[in-house]
Amino acid sequence: MITVTVYRTDGSYSGFKAEGHAGYAEEGEDIICAAASVLMINTVNAIEALTSDEVSAEEGTSGYLSCTFPGGLSPQGKLLMDAMLLGLSQVSETREADSGKPYVSVLFEEV
């Protein structure tokens, strides 16, 4: 399962971390992993390219991605994060309804 932990400080997004694999199909053929990766990486890239928000991101092995927003997020950055979370929930709900198995879990943590 892909676990995405979204960090909030005083109710505002301060970052997120993603770990794991969906397990929907074999590596290289897993459309759930691909969809989740595209949503998260595009969000990081969009915040960097389309806002003046500071972004610190680290990508690792085994589906690991960590991203923080040291100066907080602008309204545009918040909207991009909201869109990412909407996309992740829709991917998860659609595939879970098909198989009865959760592939993506989104958790929120106040830091």
Where do the language-model regions lie?
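N-terminal intrinsically disordered, cationic/polar leader segments
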Residues: M1-E29, I41, N45-V111
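Short, conserved glycine- and acidic-residue-centered signature motifs
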Residues: I32, A36
